[in-house]
A protein has these predicted regions:
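Hydrophobic alpha-helical transmembrane segments and adjacent short intramembrane/lumenal linkers
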Residues: 171, 187, 410-475
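Transmembrane alpha-helical segments in integral membrane proteins
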Residues: 85-108, 183-186, 380-404, 435, ...
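Transmembrane helical segments that form the transport core of multi-pass membrane transport proteins
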Residues: 340-397
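Membrane-interfacial helix-loop-helix connectors in multipass membrane proteins
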Residues: 149-174, 236-247, 351-358, 409-422, ...
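Final/C-terminal transmembrane alpha-helix of multipass membrane proteins
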Residues: 328-332, 467-491
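Membrane-interfacial helix-loop connectors
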Residues: 75, 79, 375-430
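Membrane-helix interface motif
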Residues: 30-46, 145-158, 343-354, 402-412, ...
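Hydrophobic alpha-helical membrane segments
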Residues: 1-340
Length: 498
């Protein structure tokens, strides 16, 4: 469910990527991009950026670079970028609402012993407008809370003292508005799910909740503060250990789900999941007989984890064999964008120098780099896969973006050095990305079918579960690829380059 939410929110970056890509296309169409890159490369070379000579005041920007920058900042380019930012903000509000609908409906279903994935899908279809409305209201509260501080800051032009005082008052007033508003809306989403009411009724129930059940409300606030404190502490610990990317897994996939299930359970007055077959629990002799089965020991946690990843590898192979066209479509988009990236940067004359000590590029024992690579690549794969829920647009964008980056780097790097630094792990990592993109297109077909009536929520839920199974298999592949990239690729590249 939370990976589904990640897929929905992945749509936010689509307009930004399109805006940047469109701007680069405009600049490349009339040679302005080539001039800008050439001037900046010359400026960087003269300033000896790699040597750190700009640590002090630094050299002045040469007239050629200043002119190239001025030529690049035109109304169409600025319009594209501003439009991309505005579109991203709007999509962010909508995507957050849809993500909340999916996760809270899924949690409520899990508490009732129903299928959480199917409930998430049907819940989004039923209550999307209420959750998007709540998301818009939350964003409006933040904007409203910022207004007093902005008005206070505007007085700095008249008097610094008055501006400082007014800004401080504005921050307190605006912060109070935001806090009170968010507290009032705390259980609105849970009310939509549990009470099956609209946005108006949900807001009313959420406002009444602290009055009717003050102990539960205060308890939830304390739990929330504890979860965010734990997340902050974990982030600090991960940063000290050099594996800050783990926060991207622990937060969205462990702590936030815990907070959501506490919220829904409190509101629904349930404390633990109730199995679907509780109503049919045997009694008497039948119960005694069933106890014999129940006493069969379950496999240990480690065995279950190993079995899950082994099953993921089986699912990975089955998906590639069963849906090769989806994987090939992802690979084709990647290759198309890579070719465009080479064309875009190959004629600029710029060149990225290789590291002087290739074999030490990640350090002697790059455990932190290894963890970073595994987490980052798996999250990229999960986003591409579950981005298919938005009709595959984020999945296609991810394939195009990754291909463009690889092609653009190839166009400005020494080809032999680039291949030596990419090929050893790329033979595993790139196919894994293609499979993730193929998963996204596979889910997109199901999502499109649901919208047109050709696919049921149950079938789409099965595709989402299959994607999770395949992602576990991809995790194994990406761990091996990261081991090669962190520990072997630098040494292989050093041997190739001499």
């Amino acid at each position: 469910m939370y990976l589904l939410g990640i897929g929905l929110t992945a749509t936010v970056r689509v307009p930004l990527i399109l805006a940047v890509g469109g701007s680069l296309g405009l600049l490349a169409s009339d040679g302005r991009l080539e001039t800008l890159v050439s001037e900046f490369t010359q400026f960087a070379r003269e300033a000896d950026l790699d040597g750190g000579s700009m640590a002090g005041s630094g050299p002045e920007i040469p007239p050629g670079l200043e002119t190239a920058l001025g030529d690049a900042i035109t109304l169409p380019v600025v319009g594209l970028l501003v439009g991309g930012v505005v579109a991203a903000l709007v999509i962010s509000v909508v995507a957050n609402g849809l993500s909340s609908a999916a996760t809270l409906h899924g949690m409520h279903a899990a508490l009732r012993g129903d299928d959480p994935v199917r409930a998430a899908i049907t819940g989004v279809g039923r209550d999307w407008s209420s959750f998007v409305g709540l998301s818009v209201l939350t964003a409006g509260l933040v904007v409203l809370g910022a207004l007093p501080a902005l008005l206070g800051a505007s007085l700095f032009a008249i008097s610094p003292a008055a501006g400082g005082l007014a800004t401080a008052v504005g921050v307190v007033l605006g912060g109070g508005i935001v806090i009170v508003g968010l507290l009032a809306l705390t259980f609105a989403g849970a009310s939509v799910v549990v009470d099956t009411v609209g946005i108006g009724g949900a807001i009313g129930e959420s406002i009444r909740f602290p009055v009717d059940r003050p102990v539960a409300f205060v308890g939830y606030i304390l739990v929330s503060l504890g979860v965010f404190g734990l997340l902050s502490a974990a982030g600090s610990l991960f940063s000290v250990l050099g594996v800050s990317q783990l926060s991207g897994l622990v937060g969205p996939l462990l702590l936030v789900p815990f907070l959501d299930i506490v919220q829904v359970a409190l509101y629904a007055e349930q404390s633990a999941p109730r199995r679907r077959d509780d109503a049919n629990t045997p009694t008497g002799a039948a119960a005694a007989e069933s106890d014999i089965v129940a006493d069969v020991p379950r496999p240990g946690a480690l065995r279950r984890i190993v079995a899950a990843f082994r099953d993921g590898l089986v699912g990975l192979g089955g998906f590639v064999r069963g849906y090769p066209l989806a994987v090939l479509a992802a690979a084709g988009l990647f290759a198309l964008a890579a070719g465009g990236g080479v064309v875009l940067t190959g004629g600029t004359g710029a060149e990225i120098p290789l590291p002087t000590e290739v074999n030490e590029v990640f350090g002697a024992v790059p455990v932190d780099v290894f963890v970073m690579l595994v987490v980052n690549n798996w999250l990229v794969s999960a986003t591409a896969a579950y981005g298919g829920i938005a009709i595959g647009i984020p999945a296609a964008t991810d394939m195009l973006l990754n291909g463009l980056i690889v092609g653009a780097l190839y166009g400005v790097a020494d080809q032999t050095g680039f291949l030596a630094l990419v090929a050893p792990h790329g033979v595993l990592e790139l196919p894994a990305i293609f499979v993730a993109g193929g998963l996204g297109f596979h889910i997109a077909a199901g999502a499109g079918g649901l919208l047109t009536g050709r696919c049921s929520a149950r079938l789409l839920a099965n595709r989402l579960r299959r994607a999770y199974r395949v992602l576990l298999g991809l995790a194994v592949v990406l761990v091996v690829a990261a081991l090669i990239e962190a520990f072997l690729t630098p040494r292989i590249a050093a041997a190739v380059l001499g």
